[in-house]
Regions:
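Solenoid-like repeat scaffolds
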Residues: 24-32, 58-69, 95-107, 133-145, ...
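Tandem amphipathic alpha-helical repeat scaffolds
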Residues: 2-9, 34-48, 70-85, 108-125, ...
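Flexible inter-repeat linkers and adjacent short helices
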Residues: 1-70, 222, 234, 241-245
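Linker/hinge segments immediately adjacent to helix-turn-helix/homeobox DNA-binding domains
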Residues: 130, 145-185, 189-280, 296
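Helix-turn-helix DNA-binding segment
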Residues: 263-314, 318-334
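Helix-turn-helix repeat elements of alpha-solenoid scaffolds
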Residues: 4-24, 42-58, 81-95, 119-134, ...
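Small side chains
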Residues: 57, 77, 170, 286-289
């Protein structure tokens, strides 16, 4: 219970409505001290300050209150990927997967299904729960978390190659929302951008990404953009590199840090071999190439010459020890 005697909600910042640019005020306005501490950890995480986020959330890893515990495990788990603390990440994420007792409230079961699914899907691993198991409990969560749940389900559809359904899930959530929840909306616009890129609707992908950036930039929310780099298939380069060079550099630094730790869990647990020795530019070009883009199309999208694309892809083949585009698929994100 919080200081008002009401049940706490997990990820209190994600659940707080505020206008972009007002995140610090939103955190300060949370009355309950423990919920405010979690919101502080969220703000640090989404700003790319993984070490400080983990430090702020760590005291709640064994909290009796499930809202505080799930929040802390989720924040510390993903922050530990960027910090290359893989045993810590595994411990935190494993704690999320532990099912609550049957006698717990529907709200607790809803938050468990959501965070257990998110902990798996965001690592591109199979979710322990289906959407059908979540739907009857969804109404027990606040709107900010329901929006995040829509992102998790959209991401799962994307991983199954159901790009149209993934896009519909994200866009419907954005259309139907009532309040302004920048964190969850950022997740959803990035998901929609991913789906549009895979459907080769570049204009729609850019529109969603530009909206995501308009949400992220006022509060410095670079972490999620960096984490989604490979799945955004060149949108970061196309939309930010020239106009926002300093922000772009920070985002790419975030990408390298997070993706290194992410692969330390994803690759052994999935049996896949997502490449870990490519630059972000090489990885993006390789992602587009294995999706059937021509060198000329890749060049136009990324603002370089076809010759540059050809040379970069030749370097990719050499690093991966392969000789054809068909062989790229085994080393790329889905």
């Amino acid at each position: 219970m919080n200081c008002d005697g009401n049940p706490r909600v997990p990820m209190s910042l994600m659940c707080t409505a505020f206008a972009p640019g007002q995140m610090d005020a939103a955190v300060a306005g949370i009355a309950d001290a423990d919920s405010r501490a979690i919101a502080t950890a969220e703000a640090l995480y989404f700003r790319g300050q993984a070490a400080l986020a983990a430090e702020a959330a760590r005291p709640y890893l064994d909290a009796a209150d499930p809202a505080l515990r799930y929040s802390a495990c989720f924040i510390c788990g993903y922050a530990s990927l960027s910090l290359n603390r893989i045993p810590d990440a595994r411990r935190c994420l494993a704690s999320i997967l532990d099912a609550p007792p049957d006698e717990e409230s529907p709200a607790v079961h809803a938050m468990h299904i959501l965070f257990a699914s998110a902990a798996s899907v965001l690592l591109h691993l199979p979710s322990p729960y289906s959407a059908e198991e979540f739907y009857p409990l969804a109404a027990h969560l606040p709107e900010g978390l329901r929006l995040f749940a829509s992102y998790v389900m959209a991401h799962a559809l994307y991983l199954r190659g159901e790009y149209g359904r993934s896009l519909g899930m994200a866009e419907n959530a954005l259309i139907m929302k009532q309040g302004s929840y920048p964190i969850s909306e950022l997740f959803l616009h990035l998901s929609a951008s991913m789906a549009c890129m895979s459907l080769k609707d570049i204009d729609a992908a850019k529109a969603h990404f530009e909206t995501a950036w308009s949400i992220a930039r006022p509060d410095g929310l670079i972490e999620l953009i960096g984490e989604h780099h490979g799945l955004l298939q060149g949108l970061i380069e196309a939309c930010l590199k020239q106009q926002y060079p300093d922000d772009f550099a920070r985002i790419i630094e975030t990408t390298y840090r997070f993706s290194y730790g992410w692969r330390r869990i994803h690759n052994p647990d999935s049996g896949e071999d997502v490449a870990d020795d490519l630059t972000t530019t090489e990885f993006t070009m390789a992602m587009l190439a294995c999706r059937g883009w021509t060198n000329a199309e890749i060049a136009r999208h990324m603002g370089v010459s076809p010759g540059t694309v050809k040379n970069r892809l030749s370097g990719v083949y050499a690093k991966l020890g392969i000789g054809t585009r068909a062989e790229l698929v085994a080393h790329m994100l889905r």
